[in-house]
């Protein structure tokens, strides 16, 4: 049987050659568990006449990836094979690749179609010796297989459909795209990114150095006007933003409700639902950057709006299709007054913004005064018990995970932009809280630090974290100036306020590396100190930039200009890790260059590239699927797998148990308690702890955070108590998604069917819902009246005799 080599020559398939190639890439791996011969045997069995060496390499990489559940080193080997394969197909020298990308001619039109901007091309050519020699290609081999495949699929630039960049080329392109002629800063950024200390957000990785460098992730839009012109002008603006890979949060509080009078036509309004359906179709049509990811809009509405009950139905899977818009995401911008009325079981009045103007433009006591004034003047459309509205919110969340919950008064009260005006909404992922208006589209550029990379010899290196965050802050500040803005309103806003968003990834991995169970005192302290370090470093860097470039335009009158920082607004004292008094003196003297700095975002794609868990989330499972173009691969939490291999507990039987138990190790008797404590999944961690951690880091987050809530068996009582707990803790984002576990598990492959049947019988019993009646727990397969009566204190009560009924404290 013959194989085609890269130069087109034919050669006989040689078992030994394949084994030797795989063996060469096994350096530093555990030779007791990683077997090159076994991989070669599986590759040979898939060979067909005329196969190319590129296809052989792909097959070898995927074969190694399927064996990851045997030992975590197989994931590293799979990546090495895939990276080595790419290296053989691409140019080595960075400046040569930049030249190829810049000089590209579209074969269909025969016209130049450069993928690198003239400015960046000129800089690279001018400094090519320095830039070419700074790149260390071995760092490509530090990615795991799935991280590398994510890069290959969406991030590395292509010529005629073939990948032209290596990961190191992409990182250097991003560094030069941000820093331009400042080669020293570009190489510093390259080194930190290539060593996995931090990463910029996806749009920055996609577009830096290209002719249209749209590097921002988030845009916050306010409707231009409640008119056909205003609605469609705003729609066009959203399309232009989405076209260049921006996610959008749009507030629609000021759009008149169904049945409102329209003076221009002497007719009545159809309300927000038909309008949202138009926006929904735009989100579907305008994808982000040539199918890299679909367009995404989140609509924000305050709960006093007369159409809010229809708004809550829009994402549901059943009902009249004319009243559904499922590609949009939905969020509530909730004033404290609404929460208070739900808690006190009082009436809630709905208004049309055309008949009761100005409610979206005020917050706090001013909002309460205006809302109650309109109530007294009988301007309301109708009123309902606030708890009935609350029930509709919960029902929608259980069915769809939406609407997101953000607390308007906390977002405004604790914002460094409160001197600019009332903040009307957040973004698509609920972590950006910035001022927007009809003539200002708020923008945010994001980056995240990889928390596990700062662990050395079992200790957390806060000084290194501080140093790296200062570099990232300077980068994000530079992006504001080099960025391409899809609409002028975005440029105006970003130049006036200069906000940036620093986030994290891999907090759960950092806990694993330091052997800290998620709910331990050590983890609680580390969570606070990490975010305190990030906030301090970002402020210090921003202050140092202000010394040279001056403060941002709207600085005067901001809380920071009066010596008030985020933790002051929370009435919290920081730890003694950093000298805050000295920093406040510096800020009083020089000011800061950026109005906002810290915003932990979901990091869904970039954390997959670096091989860490998302943002600050616990692991959702110790066994999960990773999908690449060639198929799905089963992955075991690499930290757990390493521990089980070291303790000689990992075998096929253990793997089957893990699959059978949905990635949980709590019911596996052979696994010792210290590992059970360390590797609890998010479903096994008290959500009260998750909310506590969010509140603990809140004083050092001047924007907000993408906080998901996970509930295994959601009941209206549990969700209610969580929302109220988060609201009373002072969170700005009370909830991003509500994540619930499917009642029926997916099909379990490679599992002993007898064992599975026994497990399913047990879980059927467990899934019956516990309900409290007259202080006693009863089991019911159906939700009862008491369970739906979310305001009945007994349902919310915590009972030591009935721990399963309360998920807030895990009893």
From Swiss-Prot:
One Gene Ontology term of the molecular function aspect: ribonucleoside-diphosphate reductase activity, thioredoxin disulfide as acceptor
Annotated site residues (Important for electron transfer) in this chain: 736-737
Origin superkingdom: Eukaryota
The reaction(s) this protein catalyses: a 2'-deoxyribonucleoside 5'-diphosphate + [thioredoxin]-disulfide + H2O = a ribonucleoside 5'-diphosphate + [thioredoxin]-dithiol
Description of activity control: Under complex allosteric control mediated by deoxynucleoside triphosphates and ATP binding to separate specificity and activation sites on the large subunit. The type of nucleotide bound at the specificity site determines substrate preference. It seems probable that ATP makes the enzyme reduce CDP and UDP, dGTP favors ADP reduction and dTTP favors GDP reduction. Stimulated by ATP and inhibited by dATP binding to the activity site.
Swiss-Prot/TrEMBL site (Important for hydrogen atom transfer) positions: 218, 444
Domain ATP-cone: start-end pairs: 1-92
EC number: 1.17.4.1
UniProt xrefs under InterPro entries: ATP-cone_dom, NrdE_NrdA_C, RNR_lg_C, RNR_lsu_N, RNR_R1-su_N, Rrm1
GO biological process: CDP metabolic process; dCDP biosynthetic process; deoxyribonucleotide biosynthetic process; dTTP biosynthetic process
Cellular component annotations (GO), alphabetically ordered: cytoplasm; cytosol; ribonucleoside-diphosphate reductase complex
Keywords, ordered alphabetically: Allosteric enzyme, ATP-binding, Deoxyribonucleotide synthesis, Disulfide bond, Nucleotide-binding, Oxidoreductase
Active-site residue numbers: 427, 429, 431
PANTHER family named in the record: RIBONUCLEOSIDE-DIPHOSPHATE REDUCTASE LARGE CHAIN, RIBONUCLEOSIDE-DIPHOSPHATE REDUCTASE LARGE SUBUNIT
Biological function: Provides the precursors necessary for DNA synthesis. Catalyzes the biosynthesis of deoxyribonucleotides from the corresponding ribonucleotides.
Subunit structure: Heterodimer of a large and a small subunit. Interacts with SPD1.
Name of this chain's protein: Ribonucleoside-diphosphate reductase large chain
Organism from which the protein derives: Schizosaccharomyces pombe (strain 972 / ATCC 24843) (Fission yeast)
Lineage: Eukaryota, Fungi, Dikarya, Ascomycota, Taphrinomycotina
Gene encoding the protein: cdc22
